[in-house]
């Protein structure tokens, strides 16, 4: 294996919520490939992580096995910053000669990259791949657009409820078992311990708010056959919005401080001992372990509306896809399988803590590391995904939902007005995307 000399500098940690920034990128051209060479150099772009060495070791092992099994093939890996990936990928779609053969991409980018014509349809190969039959359905959904498969899932990430065991023990309370109980527990803690946020929430924490909407039976958007129509202002969605925004106030998390917070800020508040609860991902575990609350917290699934139920979580994560422009399609698909197969995902979990996308490998991971249990349980209860539309990148990048939450939290608009405005913006994006 050859490691590219253009190793990217470390970037900010990847947020599994899917960071999309495709709106201002240039248009794409025809990216169809010519030929299918069975030897030569395959180029791969993977994301640079904070603390990337463990990931590199896992990738190196997978590549070595691939090269051993494919005489005459070499692999060159380049690690690129997450925050500039949109520009790099768009440029690659426009210039096939300089493009890699495979890329790692966030699962909320799938539909946009498919619309741009950059990703190869690997439906046939995926269906014939024996390991793929054990792929978690939600993970498979993240590589599927209009029934066709455009890559293989690499890892999945979901969120659950982190809580301070010492605070709960001191107050004689149990972890909340319903959404109403979550809200009342948060406010009780704030009342009894005013130096703490009961539940750290953020107006810019889109993927922490979504479970409240989904738990009430609401949806972000409804598929209408050829496109989507916003459902964020439906009666059920508004119940979820109202529940989430009720947590912004002096009786839990003051809007003046919390309205601007995103997911990282809420987890940081918890890890530093400023909050009794937070909605964090399996990928937040290392940060919490490194914080002031180490040894004084536990994790349970975020409760749903009915006591004992689990609120649907957003299934974030990353995939590996073959570019349509690759002149080594057969080799590239085989390398995709090597980089996302069960053996590699098991090693990646051990090295990086990324949750495997295979149900059997995920079960083994949960047995090995108990902290994974609540996240596996959350996945098993039925995680959800964003609309499979290229418009989602624009909706996410233009902060449509954070603006809605912040307007409500600040008192500038009520739930009805703010959700109506958000729905109009979403529908405009869906219409533009076609």
What are these regions (language model features)?
Residues 300, 350-397, 407, 431:
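Long, aromatic- and glycine/proline-rich binding clefts that accommodate carbohydrate-like moieties
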Residues 114-118, 138-174, 201-226, 315-321, ...:
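Periplasmic solute-binding protein
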Residues 123-135, 199, 218-239, 289-292, ...:
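Short, solvent-exposed loop/beta-turn-alpha elements that line the ligand-binding surface or hinge
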Residues 186, 229-257:
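Glycine-centered hinge/linker elements that transmit conformational signals in sensory
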Residues 107-158, 212, 298, 367-370, ...:
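Hinge/lid segment of periplasmic solute-binding proteins
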Residues 2-112, 306, 330-331, 417, ...:
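Conserved N-terminal structural module of periplasmic/extracytoplasmic solute-binding proteins
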Residues 68, 171, 246-252, 289-354:
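Extracytoplasmic/periplasmic substrate-recognition and gating elements
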Residues 169-170, 381-434:
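Conserved C-terminal helix/tail region of periplasmic/extracytoplasmic solute-binding proteins
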